[in-house]
Design a protein with these regions (language model features):
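H-loop/switch region of ABC-family ATPase nucleotide-binding domains
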Residues: 75-76
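Conserved ABC ATPase signature
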Residues: 15-19, 23
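Conserved catalytic motifs of ABC-family nucleotide-binding domains
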Residues: 36
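A short, surface-exposed alpha-helical micro-motif characterized by mixed small hydrophobic
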Residues: 81-83
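ABC ATPase C-loop
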Residues: 32-33
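Helical segment within the ABC ATPase nucleotide-binding domain
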Residues: 55-67
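Catalytic Walker B motif of ABC-type/P-loop ATPase nucleotide-binding domains
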Residues: 40-44
Length: 118
């Protein structure tokens, strides 16, 4: 586990309350992975984190996926999802508006106009 999340070794025995948001997310992911799950459920794993931490978590999740763990996540960060996920679903008001590969979703004109326009 420490190989995937070396930051956990650095924080050692620190109490969870003393950890940064990114360290807490990594700790939560690490704890979940210790059970050798077949399925990992994540709710907003990139929320409120610095871009470097988000990139690190994306890399960890890619490695976890390569190891055969299925990952189901909900997140608003499309760049993060594109790095981690094979497929995606766009939800609006609790209903699926679009589903497909991440490339298909990112190329969809309605998604770009509605959710990615600045």
């Amino acid at each position: 586990m420490v190989e995937l999340l070396p930051k956990l070794k650095e924080v050692g025995r620190a109490r969870g309350l003393n950890l940064s948001g990114g360290e807490r997310k990594m700790l939560a992911i690490g704890r979940a992975l210790m059970a050798n799950p077949a399925l990992l459920l994540l709710d907003e794993p990139s929320e409120g984190l610095a871009p470097l931490v988000v990139a690190h978590i994306a890399e960890v999740l890619r490695l976890v996926k390569q190891a055969g763990v299925t990952i189901l996540l909900a997140d608003q960060n499309l760049r993060f999802c594109r790095k981690v996920c094979d497929r995606g679903y766009v939800l609006e008001k609790g209903r699926v508006q679009l589903e497909g590969t991440m490339d298909e979703i990112c190329r969809d004109e309605q998604v770009v106009r509605k959710y990615l326009a600045v």
